[in-house]
Swiss-Prot record:
The lineage of its organism: Eukaryota, Metazoa, Chordata, Craniata, Vertebrata. This is Signiferin-2.1. Keywords: Amidation, Amphibian defense peptide, Antibiotic, Antimicrobial, Secreted. The modification Leucine amide is found at L15. One of its GO terms (cellular component) is extracellular region. It is found in: Secreted. Has antibacterial activity against a wide spectrum of Gram-positive bacteria including B.cereus (MIC=25 uM), E.faecalis (MIC=100 uM), L.lactis (MIC=12 uM), L.innocua (MIC=50 uM), M.luteus (MIC=25 uM), S.aureus (MIC=12 uM), S.epidermidis (MIC=25 uM) and S.uberis (MIC=25 uM). Lacks antibacterial activity against the Gram-negative bacteria E.cloacae and E.coli. Inhibits the formation of NO by neuronal nitric oxide synthase with an IC(50) of 12.4 uM. It comes from the Eukaryota. GO terms for biological process: defense response to Gram-positive bacterium; negative regulation of nitric-oxide synthase activity. It comes from Crinia signifera. Its main location: secreted. Expressed by the skin glands.
Amino acid sequence: IIGHLIKTALGMLGL
C-alpha cells in the first residue's frame, strides 16, 4: 500500500 511505500522511502533515507 502507499503507506508501505512511504515507510520504505523513509527507511532508505534513514540509512
